[in-house]
Amino acid sequence: MQKQKIRIRLKAFDYKLIDQSALEIVDTAKRTGAIVKGPVPLPTRMQRFDILRSPHVNKSSRDQFEIRTHQRLMDIVDPTDKTVDALMKLDLPAGVDVEIKLQ
């Protein structure tokens, strides 16, 4: 039988929140007997915006804003049924986006 793998990708604006969530997922998977590879930090995506301060003149006066999207990747190799059930019941914070792929 072919080995199954679960790939989990986390995205969040706050790096503390994403690290905490990754740690919870790793602990849950290890408790149920699965092998975990990761979390691997992926490159942080930065979006920068320049906005004029004044509504009419003073083009040289601008505000700069930045949004950073942090990402983590982890693989769960050869998961058991217990692992899948435990991951489904796991309650993660609202600011973390989770993508799960079965391979």
Swiss-Prot record:
One of its GO terms (cellular component) is ribonucleoprotein complex. One of its GO terms (molecular function) is structural constituent of ribosome. GO terms for biological process: translation. InterPro entries: Ribosomal_uS10, Ribosomal_uS10_CS, Ribosomal_uS10_dom, Ribosomal_uS10_dom_sf. Belongs to the universal ribosomal protein uS10 family. PANTHER family: 30S RIBOSOMAL PROTEIN S10 FAMILY MEMBER. Involved in the binding of tRNA to the ribosomes. This is Small ribosomal subunit protein uS10. It comes from Methylibium petroleiphilum (strain ATCC BAA-1232 / LMG 22953 / PM1). The lineage of its organism: Bacteria, Pseudomonadati, Pseudomonadota, Betaproteobacteria, Burkholderiales.
